[in-house]
């Protein structure tokens, strides 16, 4: 008897699987992903999984004409392979986090009558999750009132680093491991004003931009901690008093778990504008700020330094539940036992 975990492509999806699997120690776990995207990089050598499989699949929605047909054919072939694996490992439940790499296994679960539990990480539903939602045994979303579990699966370390913010002594710019040009530009524009106020700068500029951004800071005589990918993100968040960040779901909830007040600048080309709606979920509760990339105003950004951080920080501590990963893991265990 096993629990099958599937989905990914991007770090946001994969972070959910990572958080949940850590609460499933002792269970037989199988991961099925794609050769495209980051799946293999994250889980190929992960010893928590009994076996890992990576099929040749790719997105369908972003393809046209013959490319779409080819993607569908690849998915059909992968689905047949996934069905065999569900039978081989006597799968009792399939946990899907969405993304194109989950499609084959999610459809295999439906065709083989294996319970399908779906986690939707964004406020705007992904195309695949929207399609499969009526067939899911459970559909989990932190943004939906009817969700059986509202808590987002966040790694414990982010809760361990929680603290109430009052004054801005350190600011962190988070553009993700790939970086965000708009956030990099904003950081460098306001850096002199931050220096005048004695505010320390931590800046995730993106792997490809590290050298350029470091030089830009040096050219204007400002010390800043600049990095790309890091395994110490929770520690950096702990040190910061204010964040300026993209609004990917994992980043948003990790910042919230750390009770770090944030100005979100959503990635403007995200599918269904989901980053905007992710951020809006907190903005409507007066727990964050939002600014469209094309409407960035440095004076308004600097004005946030004098805002009431404590109220937002305490508010974040109240709305974020700590045991989302465990709640999902317990649900999967119940299906595995039935």
UniProtKB/Swiss-Prot annotation:
Keywords: Cell cycle, Cell division, Cell inner membrane, Cell membrane, Cell shape, Cell wall biogenesis/degradation, Glycosyltransferase, Membrane, Peptidoglycan synthesis, Transferase. GO terms for cellular component: plasma membrane. Its EC number is 2.4.1.227. It is found in: Cell inner membrane. The gene is murG. GO terms for molecular function: UDP-N-acetyl-D-glucosamine:N-acetylmuramoyl-L-alanyl-D-glutamyl-meso-2,6-diaminopimelyl-D-alanyl-D-alanine-diphosphoundecaprenol 4-beta-N-acetylglucosaminlytransferase activity; undecaprenyldiphospho-muramoylpentapeptide beta-N-acetylglucosaminyltransferase activity. Cell wall formation. Catalyzes the transfer of a GlcNAc subunit on undecaprenyl-pyrophosphoryl-MurNAc-pentapeptide (lipid intermediate I) to form undecaprenyl-pyrophosphoryl-MurNAc-(pentapeptide)GlcNAc (lipid intermediate II). This is UDP-N-acetylglucosamine--N-acetylmuramyl-(pentapeptide) pyrophosphoryl-undecaprenol N-acetylglucosamine transferase. The lineage of its organism: Bacteria, Pseudomonadati, Campylobacterota, Epsilonproteobacteria, Campylobacterales. PANTHER family: GLYCOSYLTRANSFERASE, UDP-N-ACETYLGLUCOSAMINE--N-ACETYLMURAMYL-(PENTAPEPTIDE) PYROPHOSPHORYL-UNDECAPRENOL N-ACETYLGLUCOSAMINE TRANSFERASE 1. GO terms for biological process: carbohydrate metabolic process; cell division; cell wall organization; lipid glycosylation; peptidoglycan biosynthetic process; regulation of cell shape. Its main location: membrane. It comes from the Bacteria.
């Amino acid at each position: 008897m096993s629990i099958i975990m599937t989905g990914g492509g991007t770090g946001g999806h994969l972070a959910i699987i990572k958080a949940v699997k850590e609460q499933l120690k002792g269970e037989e776990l199988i991961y099925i992903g794609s050769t495209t995207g980051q799946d293999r990089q994250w889980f190929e050598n992960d010893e928590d999984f009994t076996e890992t499989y990576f099929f040749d699949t790719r997105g369908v929605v972003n393809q046209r004409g013959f490319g779409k047909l080819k993607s569908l054919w690849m998915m059909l072939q992968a689905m047949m392979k996934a069905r065999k694996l569900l039978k081989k490992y006597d799968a009792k439940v399939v946990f899907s986090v969405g993304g194109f790499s989950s499609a084959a296994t999610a459809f295999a679960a439906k065709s083989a009558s294996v319970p399908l539990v779906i986690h939707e990480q964004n406020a705007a539903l992904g195309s695949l999750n929207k399609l499969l939602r009526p067939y899911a045994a459970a559909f989990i979303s932190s943004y939906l009132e009817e969700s059986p579990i509202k808590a987002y699966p966040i790694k414990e370390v982010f809760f361990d680093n929680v603290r109430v913010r009052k004054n801005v002594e350190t600011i962190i710019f988070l553009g993700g491991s790939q970086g965000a040009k708009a956030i990099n530009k904003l950081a460098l524009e306001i850096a002199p004003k931050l220096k005048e106020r004695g505010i320390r700068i931590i800046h995730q500029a993106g792997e490809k931009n590290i050298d350029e951004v470091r030089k830009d800071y040096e050219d204007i005589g400002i010390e800043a901690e600049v990095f790309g990918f890091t395994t110490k993100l929770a520690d950096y968040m702990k040190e910061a008093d204010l964040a300026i960040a993209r609004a990917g779901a994992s980043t948003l909830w990790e910042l919230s778990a750390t009770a770090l007040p944030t100005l979100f600048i959503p990635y403007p080309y995200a599918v269904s504008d989901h980053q905007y709606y992710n951020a809006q979920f907190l903005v409507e509760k007066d727990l964050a700020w939002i600014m469209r990339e094309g409407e960035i105003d440095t004076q308004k950004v600097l004005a946030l330094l004098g805002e009431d951080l404590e109220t937002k920080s305490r508010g974040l501590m109240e709305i974020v539940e700590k045991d989302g990963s465990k709640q999902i893991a317990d649900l999967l265990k119940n299906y595995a036992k039935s």
